[in-house]
Amino acid sequence: MAGTTSAIDPVFIIISRFWGKRMIVFGKKELFEINPLLTWFFRCMGGVCVRGTREELAVIDNTIAACKEGDTLLIFPEGTREREGKILPPKSGMFVVAAQAGVDVVPCRIFYDTPNGRAKLFCRVRVVYGEPMPAAQFAMQDKRDVKAMRAGKKALTEAWEQLGEPYAFAPKDA
């Protein structure tokens, strides 16, 4: 589970941790329309275009089954790229997938060595992973277990915050 600032973020995560492994990469429709090369890369790495509609329940069910069999899922649970350097709250869907698949969640953050912290050509990049969060932490009574989802969101946000300042690049002048 990663916070995202750029459409290129999945590339760095895949290269830094999962190179050579097949994985499922959830991405919004817009991610697959940015650049033909990125689209090709995401598709080769197991990219799945998710529009957030109810018609995609089969995709979610297939993903849960694949995770139960040991596949890795890369998802950016905020559902959008953040623009101001702030951590956005994760959306609930990720917690439903994690709970039903019974898989641990590994928090992740990406930092760019630029004045505004956004990706730029040839800038330094730091990908930081937190400790795995046990699947039991995301267990739910049902898909609408609001109390469990709130607790999961809080725990993931806190994990992202812990991966912040000690690992971020020192601020630069614009």
Where are these regions (language model features)?
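Non-catalytic C-terminal accessory region of glycerolipid acyltransferases
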Residues: A58-A174
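Catalytic core of membrane glycerolipid acyltransferases/transacylases, capturing the structured
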Residues: M1-R54
